């Protein structure tokens, strides 16, 4: 199930986040934010094939930090100097609708419902503040041509908070080559799974005759 929950938010006095999470927990119904059918198709296929926690979020590579600063209303990109790779080029801020992303309680290391963050939605709306456990993750999305899946394994190093912004709790993901990710990514909307799942994704996509391109 999916609706254009942001751009058509004026039709409702709330957001569908909690309803979608309840529907997933009750019947494993896959949800789609912002009417992104390609993300929803990717999420459906990978979740059914791999049976791993997965959600859609926004990617903000450090190499393109300008849009992140503007879109999320944050003053600077997260400080990564304390991580194993101190090169900021190889990091991505991941955030969606004020927090890390929309995931059900069974996927989260922590999970809390919060008041809305974005100005575009009704004052009665809500958002989900949840986290994956830190550690290995995989970013993936079907290419618009539907002929290949773009994917990369990385590490969720931690979280960054920016009070008063549109990113109250975002994830900080390390990837092997930030330049390669920027060249290969097809959208700012991407799926993120727990664990390193590239090999399993290659096997699953082979069933559908779909290739896998590593970013």
Predicted regions: what they are:
Residues 2-215:
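Anaerobic metallocofactor- and corrinoid-dependent redox/one-carbon enzyme cores
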